[in-house]
Amino acid sequence: MKIIKTLTDMIEDELEGAEHYAECALMYKEDHPQLANTLYEISTQEMRHVNLLHEEVVAVIKKHREAHGEPPAAMQEIYEWVHIRQIEMAKEIKILQSQFREG
């Protein structure tokens, strides 16, 4: 379904942004603490966007199941692969964010 592809692309964009901002926050933490805090906050906001978009994907899949039954197996496999990859990205970002908070 095209809408799921669009939403998963948006999720990946948000994840990439969150990672970029978290890395920059770590890079500037010592010399520019105010900037680093701002970048960290932007990173956490991007992760909130990821969660909101994921909730929308879940809702679309649920609506499809109610109206048409299970999605085709190939589509489900692709979505699961993308979802697992996104979960791994989110874990790495949370590690970066944790390093910022603890460091």
Q: Where on the chain are the PLM-derived regions?
A:
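Non-heme di-metal
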Residues: 1-103
